[in-house]
A protein has these predicted regions:
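Preference for long, amphipathic alpha-helical scaffolds in soluble/luminal domains
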Residues: 1-543
Length: 543
């Protein structure tokens, strides 16, 4: 629809409302580009190769356009579209373009080889890159840091049990462990054989694979391997040689059951793009062409987004609920309710229809937190509610309630409050999907090389602020609950104050770092009752 103009509003707000009205999806949400990481398309294409299902021409051309357009001047590709070149991404993108039909003598591919070969090529890639190459038969499994499935057989009380990891981390290493144990590998083709010859600076047959396990280029060593991790890798390597066959099979059964639970709970969407592809490959290896594979293949396109720079794989199946909740709050802040009523009604319907209404079946067996009443980042079908998404869904609903447009029944709004409360950590803050389960020292065992703070779901200022704001809004809406929520709000406020830096800033983790942190830090304190002359707010304002 086209929003009629109003001379009462500043032109910037006018244009903003017009854009929101014009870009709303028929289902009531706003869909946007959630791309950026450059290693996702290579993982997608690798998955297609392992499935034996090449990309259709339109998908192929879209991927090529995206990858070609983001090559750095030095010939490499970054971890994301704005980063310096990484061996991890550069090798994977090279392989991907070759799989998509680009010849080895292509000028861009020649520049890529000229960059990554002197940096060590696959032997110096971050660990995830080596793993994907191993799946394609372009890297030996002997050169991988072990990913044994037997970790899932450890007593659940131990901090090293995978259930203690941040859910994104454990859901990636879950299928990795199955594929590693099975030494899954794509069918050899002349093209793969040719690529294998192109990406190494030395003959493939002469590589010292055991030495390559701990080799990482400086470009990829964002989180350098600690002595603890190296010791753990050594112990796991020993276990890999000694693991009894019966124990391995039992562990693989446990892992496959956990994969099944994740697939069913997310309608085969999966929590994120990496485990989406890897889970698909697991089932193709376990039951080729079976119903699990077909169910996964149908949802693979959920992760694709076509933009001005080409076709990309997003970091989530969408960001719809998050974007819609903020769009609603932004529209309501203008006061133009009547003018935007049809837009708000559709958005209210989307918010209502995407609240999670029930817990995951046998959630304890799948190591899942409660879900009932929460909102996800994207869609209800995705099945993973998040603390701040629940908070923003609740805030948007309560603001819609004030203008008579909310469609979420009051009992379900209260369930959202209960979901938020269930996620408050002992330190008073809120993490993302779950309570903090493992100790922070687990980060010393981070095996990814290219990512940090992935091992444990810790409290963040953004999540904490959003939850404090939502609880404060509910207290105003339902005064009878104000006493019940007073202590959780105060604990959240204390956490926000504790993590403020000496210069008055907050370090954000889920947006544009300090700008994002300052926005949420100040908003959380104000919602908790801080006055304009509060020292923390004055420091945040630079006064």
């Amino acid at each position: 629809m086209t929003a009629p103009r109003s001379s009462a509003l500043p032109s910037a707000i006018e244009r903003g409302l017009e854009v929101l009205a014009a870009t709303q999806d028929e289902g009531g949400s706003w869909k946007g580009d959630y791309g950026g990481p450059l290693f996702l398309v290579p993982v997608y294409v690798a998955g297609l190769e392992l499935l034996g299902r090449p990309a259709d021409p339109a998908t192929r051309e879209g991927f090529i356009e995206f990858l070609r357009g983001h090559q750095n001047p030095d010939g490499g590709w970054g971890l994301d579209v704005e980063s310096h070149s990484h061996v991890f991404t550069s090798v994977l993108v090279y392989v991907t373009l070759r799989l998509l039909g680009i010849p080895a003598d292509d000028a861009q591919l020649q520049r890529a080889r000229a960059w990554f070969l002197p940096h060590g090529g696959p032997l110096s890639s971050g660990s995830w890159g080596k793993f994907i190459l191993a799946l394609l038969g372009l890297y030996s499994y002997e050169g991988l840091v072990p990913v044994p499935p037997e970790l899932w057989l450890l007593p659940e009380s131990l901090p090293l049990h995978p259930s203690k990891l941040w859910c994104h981390c454990r859901m990636v290493y879950l299928p990795m462990s199955w594929l590693y144990a099975r030494r899954a590998r794509a069918k050899e083709t002349p093209l793969l054989a040719a690529i294998r010859e192109e990406i190494y600076a030395e003959p493939y047959e002469t590589v010292d694979w055991v030495a390559a396990r701990e080799r990482v280029a400086d470009t990829d060593a964002y989180t350098p391997r600690t002595s603890y991790l190296r010791a753990a890798n050594g112990a796991l390597g020993l276990w890999e040689r000694l693991a009894p066959a019966g124990t391995r099979e039992r562990a693989l059964d446990v892992v496959l059951d956990q994969i099944r639970r994740e697939d069913e709970a997310t309608n085969h969407i999966c929590i994120g793009p990496i485990n989406k592809v890897l889970n698909t490959v697991v089932w193709q290896s376990a039951r080729p062409g079976g119903p699990e594979v077909e169910a996964h293949v149908k949802r693979l396109p959920d992760y694709l987004w076509r933009a001005a720079d080409g076709l990309k794989m997003q970091g989530y199946n969408s960001s719809e609920l998050w974007d819609t909740a903020f769009a609603v709050q932004g529209i309501l802040a203008t006061g133009e309710v009547e003018r935007m009523r049809p837009v708000l009604e559709r958005a209210a319907h989307y918010i209502e229809s995407n609240q999670v209404l029930e817990d995951v079946r046998e959630m304890e067996k799948g190591y899942r937190h409660r879900s009932r009443g929460g909102w996800p980042f994207s869609t209800r079908a995705h099945g993973w509610p998040i603390s701040d998404c629940t908070a923003e869904g609740l805030k948007a609903s309560l603001q819609l309630e004030k203008v008579g447009l909310n469609q979420v029944p009051r009992p379900r709004l209260r369930e959202a409050v209960e979901e938020i409360l269930s996620l408050q950590n002992e330190d008073g803050g809120w993490a993302t999907y779950e309570l903090q389960r493992g100790p922070r020292w687990l980060e010393a065992l981070n095996p990814s090389d290219v990512f940090s703070t992935i091992m444990v779901d810790v409290s963040y200022v953004e999540c904490t602020s959003a939850c404090v704001q939502a609880l404060a809004a509910w207290s105003a809406f339902a005064p009878e609950d104000a006493g019940w929520l007073r202590d959780p709000i105060r604990r959240g406020e204390r956490f926000i104050r504790q993590v403020q830096r000496e210069d008055g800033s907050w370090e954000g983790s889920w947006g544009v770092c300090f700008s994002y942190g300052a926005w949420f830090g100040t908003a959380g304190l104000i919602a908790a009752g801080a006055r304009p002359d509060d020292p923390a707010l004055r420091r945040a304002a630079g006064r």
